[in-house]
Amino acid sequence: MIQPDPTVLALALLLDLCLGDPRWLPHPVVMIGRLITFLETLLRRCMANERIAGVLLLALTVTSAASVTWLMVWGSARLHALAGLMVAALLSSTCLAARSLQRESCLVADALDAGDIASARVKLSYIVGRDTVDLDEEEIWRALIETVAENTTDGIIAPLFWLALGGPVAGMAFKAVSTLDSMVGYKNERYLRLGWASARMDDLVNYIPARLTALLMVMVAPLIGLSQANAASIALRDRLNHPSPNSAHPESAAAGALGIRLGGPSTYGGLLSVKQFIGDPLRSIDGQAYRGMIRLMYATTLAMAVISLATAALLRGIHVTQL
């Protein structure tokens, strides 16, 4: 169960797509977040060099998450093979966020459809890092589509990639890196030095998945009534139009497929950040564009599921042959 296993991966996908992250079930990311907070406080007290402290924070968090996952899967499998299978599948499913991404983004979309911009701003603030208090309706739709596009990589394709290659241990290690980046990977006075290692590692572990996401979006676009030609054209043209080395890849493919323009100026913590535009404004950014983005997210997920299951089956076969 610790090795890549297509059965575990298939069950994890079904659990995520059907249930998402039930609010009553303790989530590993919450526990990882608490560990990060504890380690950050400890390292700041014990170490003067924040860059070295940042490396230790990364190493300790990822090692802890991977080790606990390994022990849980190994221990449950020792009790019974079925228990090992279910624990591995459950832990793997917590690395995926397709259903949660749709659910949380849909709350914003529903508020906008109801004409409640104030509520939409508040709900959007829960899932994006930018300031939302002064956003107008189109800016809210833009931010919403951008976060769904970017999180298609972070929350779905990248976890599937690592689960297929390394099973639940690799999947949880990736989740630890992603959580670190979301908590300490900021270029501000507090985290510029402490968070640099986590931010760079997040760039690294998402490097291939981000480009794979863009490729899959281009491939599946015509299957759901979107433009493949424009998706490919904009992805090639605008894939580097972002401070992050990865974010613009899925955003550019999505913008091209939908025929919309993303990017541009945004405010973070009261500071204006002027980003390059991604895509061309061939159509308005509205609820229809958002729903197209959700279709694109799910189509991309299904395409990656096929690739991941095939990869896990191949690696499983190689492992069994070597025994």
UniProtKB/Swiss-Prot annotation:
Can you name the source organism? Pelobacter propionicus (strain DSM 2379 / NBRC 103807 / OttBd1)
Q: Which domain of life is it from?
A: Bacteria
What pathway is this protein a component of? Answer: Cofactor biosynthesis; adenosylcobalamin biosynthesis
Family, per entry: Belongs to the CobD/CbiB family.
Which GO terms of the cellular component aspect does the record hold? plasma membrane
The gene that this protein is the product of is: cobD
Compartments where located: Cell membrane
**Which UniProt keywords are listed?**
Cell membrane, Cobalamin biosynthesis, Membrane, Transmembrane, Transmembrane helix
Keyword Ribosomal protein included in the entry's annotation:
no
Recall the GO molecular function terms of this protein's record.
ABC-type vitamin B12 transporter activity; threonine-phosphate decarboxylase activity
What is the name of the protein in this document? Cobalamin biosynthesis protein CobD
Q: Does the keyword Transmembrane apply?
A: yes
